[in-house]
């Protein structure tokens, strides 16, 4: 088995699904945003504000290369922008958690949106969402309809890997 890599726009449920997959498959779960945040000593929002998005993307790119060296399979929850990195290819079996923008925004309360620097301006966030959709689809081994909730997404992933 290869790494199971969850991709999708922020708020699509990647972190929650990763935890459930880890339990179901008895695999360790890794969260790229959390790893970067712990290593840098700042939240993702603080990294964006203090070090800039370019530095965050560099940390992300380097982490992908590092994850490729792991010998055992993991469930990997990724940040929404990770698909901009060419080196994502070959990391593992990739599942795109697809959801429409309006549903994503409804799922995130104000507190959650404040943690996500790219959601400060909803008009710009929607443009980013639309721009990234093609990249998510291009990089996905499988597309998961994430509108049906966590249990439905879990069932879909488990069916694909059965």
Curated annotation (Swiss-Prot):
GO terms for molecular function: ATP binding; magnesium ion binding; shikimate kinase activity. Its cofactor is Mg(2+). InterPro entries: P-loop_NTPase, Shikimate/glucono_kinase, Shikimate_kinase/TSH1, Shikimate_kinase_CS. PROSITE patterns: SHIKIMATE_KINASE (PS01128). It catalyses: shikimate + ATP = 3-phosphoshikimate + ADP + H(+). One of its GO terms (cellular component) is cytosol. It comes from the Bacteria. Catalyzes the specific phosphorylation of the 3-hydroxyl group of shikimic acid using ATP as a cosubstrate. This is Shikimate kinase. The gene is aroK.
């Amino acid at each position: 088995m290869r790494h199971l890599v969850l991709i999708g726009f922020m708020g699509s449920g990647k972190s929650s699904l990763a935890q459930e997959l880890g339990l179901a498959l008895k695999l360790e779960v890794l969260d790229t945003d959390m790893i970067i945040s712990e290593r840098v000593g700042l939240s993702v929002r603080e990294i964006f504000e203090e070090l800039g998005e370019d530095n965050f993307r560099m940390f992300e790119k380097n982490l992908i290369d590092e994850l490729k060296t792991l010998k055992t399979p993991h469930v990997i929850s990724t940040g929404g922008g990770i698909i901009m990195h060419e080196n994502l290819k070959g990391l593992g079996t990739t599942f795109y958690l697809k959801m429409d923008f309006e549903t994503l925004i409804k799922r995130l309360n104000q507190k959650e949106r404040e943690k996500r620097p790219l959601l400060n301006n909803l008009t710009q966030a929607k443009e980013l969402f639309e721009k990234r959709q093609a990249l998510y689809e291009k990089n996905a081994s499988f597309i998961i309809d994430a509108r049906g909730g966590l249990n439905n997404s879990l069932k879909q992933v488990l069916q694909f890997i059965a």
